[in-house]
Structure formats: C-alpha cells, structure tokens
Amino acid sequence: RDVAKKGLKRIMTLGGAYGTRNYTVKDLRDQKGVKVLVETVPFTPEEAAAAEEAGVDTMKVRFDPSNPEPAIAMRSAAPNTFMAFSVPLVAAASETEAVRLAYKAMVVGADAIMCQWSPRFISAATEAGVPVQGHAGLVPRRSTWTGGLKAVGMTVEEALWVFQKIKEFESAGAYAVEVEVIPEELLAAISKRTTLLTSSIGAGSGGDMQFLFAEDILGNNPPP
C-alpha cells in the first residue's frame, strides 16, 4: 500500500528478483505524446542516488560484462528508478551472444538494455523478452559511415535514412530509440511517425524523452 502511495510499481526482474520501479516499459510507452520524460546517465552511485531523489524519470548506466560491479552499484544507489544498461557494441558478434549479453545485464538489475546493435541483434534480444533501446542519428562508434562526429540528417537523403533506421528498430521489437544530433524539426516529425519512444540527445525538444547528462542536471560543471 505504501508503495502505491509513492507511485511505485511492484515488479519482478527478468533475473527473478522482486523490486519496485517508478515506471515499467508499459508505463513509459503510455507516456508517449502525453508527457516529456527526463533521462540521464550517472557516472557514480552518488549521482544515481541524487538523480533518483530529484525525481529523474529514467537512467542509462554503462554496463561492462567483464566488470559488472559499477553497474550493480548504480542499481543499488537508485533502486526505484527505471534503468537501462548500455551494453558494449563489440561485446556481441552473433544473435546468440547478443541475447546472452542482454541476459547478463538484466540479471544484475537492468530494466532494459541500450545498444548500438543492428536490427537483427535487437530482434533476437526482444524475442528473448528483453526490452531494448536502439541508437540512431549520430552513433559515435559508427560515425565513419556518416562523415565523422557531426550532425546527421541535414539533407533529405540523410533524413530519410535516419527515419528508415528507426522504423527498422520498431519492426525489430525495440521499445525506444536514442536519437543523437539530428535537426529538431526532423526528430519532431519522426516522433509522430513511430511507436518508439524517442530519446533526444542534442536533437532538440521534439522527442518523447530529453536525455541530459547528470553533470548538467546536478550542476557539477562550472558555467561557460
């Protein structure tokens, strides 16, 4: 009863642990077009705890399968906040490895995974029951294909390419997509044409979520 009063949901993780969360995947999807959510990436347990106390909606946490302890510490510091673990791009070289890596993240506390995988790998993970957030627009580790670390979607051809990628993630079963450094008008148009939650990072206010770094939210950086 106290949990419900706090607006939390009782859940069981994919790893079989009981817990409480501010959002489930269904809750997040229900907010599309209703409320713009705030997402952040903490780099320390202290930042994660502060973000939860401040009421940040969701978090992304870096997950290293060879050293899971930092991600586990983040989960412990913010036990009630929906948390996607960002998995390394090159840690999975097949659909089977993608599912295995996703399961490793979910077992230690992830509510979802965030990845730079192809639709084929995303489909394998979602078919295994893992909520997945893809990555479109400027994907830094794939930036050689888009001309380097710069804005993407500045031409009609690029804009259509970004939209196509997002629709491929949608078809693969993803629930969300991080959209990085594309024109604000393009993200606004895409958000209306996909069922995915769009998380804007440097792409203006047209997304369903605003992805902000914890240092900026918490004021850890001196003003310019």
Where are these regions (language model features)?
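Alpha/beta enzyme core
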Residues: 2-224
